[in-house]
């Protein structure tokens, strides 16, 4: 059977027979690595192109190194420990997560540098955070805080386990997500954290919700100024300053170029690893600054045509359960008339085969003049828009080489 990377769960659960596979997994009877993705395929499947993963990992780590940044890629994008291993081997500081549960997944798979990029109020979660250095004195696990209530909850948990909670004060902007809305509030939360015995490490924010890179750059500069005012409350020799969605991180780099020498900038971008054919393809900073590098889309979803009920319409057995749709519909990258590994793949002329609509389990294709003729049984290969809501549809994702042969299977932990 094909090796599943980063998965120590039982192969079967709940008494189901071994022939019932986890979503995305190859057929248990399929050959090990080396078979074509369509051999013994249970479509739809999601694949990751290994060469694109390697390329994107190297490009982003080189970018961070070139600009003197620490990189803590957001694990919530893929929740795949095997992909985290790649990022860490390339030089990432650790990982970012959105919740304590996600932090537990990272920790259980050996990653002990973790930033929980949210305020944590759950007592059990805070107690777990506070006890990490007892488990591993070299661990570095932090979370955000943006309220006195959050400070008090963390302090109670810290006392309950005789541990330590390390925090970053989160600063936001009006109409945005979490984070205090003023310098005065930031000072108050920072002072409360220190007075409560928490370990204040620095300041954090999220610029990804701002409308453009120029606005993001100006806002980050303002947050950096507040961080400088709070710096005397940070006892450590070096303070942390964390930012980083996947759309405006070039603005972050500009804004922190003249930062104090004792400040480490921790970038949290996550979507770069797999990139996409839609939302981030349009917004990536590498598109604005091609001299810094370029990313390649790694994700493809393979589905089979099940019906061609009328001229100009084809239905594929791929739907909202299989692809992201919150930031744009999938795009058709290729079709394979005949639908087997031996049939040649065809790239349709631009605009001739498009996704018009998604239902839970159906994709409506619109076909115009010049589109290749589709019949039931043909295979369509889709690119996606927004990787952060693509991975959660799958429990296993197949790694493929550039000739579409399977090289392994990666497990996700949502």
Regions found by a protein language model. Give the residues of each.
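Active-site loop/helix belt of alpha/beta enzymes
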Residues: 166, 172-290
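Flexible, glycine/charged-enriched surface loops at secondary-structure junctions
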Residues: 69-70, 232-240, 391-394
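Active-site-proximal beta-alpha core segment in soluble small-molecule metabolic enzymes
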Residues: 72-214
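Conserved, mostly hydrophobic/aromatic
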Residues: 53, 76, 106, 169, ...
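C-terminal accessory subdomain/extension
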Residues: 311-414
